């Protein structure tokens, strides 16, 4: 029989959890018994709403505003999580920016900012939670990445594709290094997911959507709950033999 609360007693930090995929993850983790840290970088209102929803459902949650591209802010967030709940057992890195630009049009600052948000943020979070996980001999690190990390599918996304490939490599390196300490590290690559994204960025949004559906074996766009369920599997004892994926 499946445990209805497989994360009972665990503490999870989920970055970018004020909306969309991150919100679905943090709410599912709470329903599974975890204490959760809801993070946002710009909208306090969204973070507070998610925290209120979780508390109304009987869960334990705090909201922490922090720019995940700022190493000091991430360190302070993890410290607040540990001070509040005792430790951090699960860390989900779920922040990404994406913009269509030809490589010759990307400024050095835009390149560096994208790398910092999409790739460095995963490192900033991992370096802070790993000591806590090593102390307990148990930990789960999950990166929300993207299919761009496997192959370059769309032109004008050079900076994003580079970051996603880096995130995948980072997870594999973490898995190799941290496995003996009881810590797993994996990526989840959502693909086409229904979120609040602006579909108007595409020249023909409906044509693009139909083409994506046709390329997906199950013939539908994914939901945020699909991604949250995958993360829940990796975050519990069920994911204990999966690492470096």
Residue ranges, per PLM feature:
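A glycine/serine/threonine-rich, flexible loop-to-helix segment
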Residues: 3, 48, 105, 155-157, ...
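Conserved glycine-rich cofactor-binding loop
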Residues: 11, 18-20
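C-terminal substrate-recognition "lid" of short-chain dehydrogenase/reductases
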Residues: 85, 123, 138, 220-245
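Substrate-binding pocket helix/loop in short-chain dehydrogenase/reductase
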Residues: 102-103, 110-115, 208, 212
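Alpha-helical segment proximal to the catalytic Tyr-Lys
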Residues: 131, 176-177, 240
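Catalytic loop of short-chain dehydrogenase/reductase
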Residues: 142-166, 171-180, 192-193
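Short, small/polar-rich loop/turn modules that mediate ligand/substrate recognition or access, typified
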Residues: 179, 184, 242-244
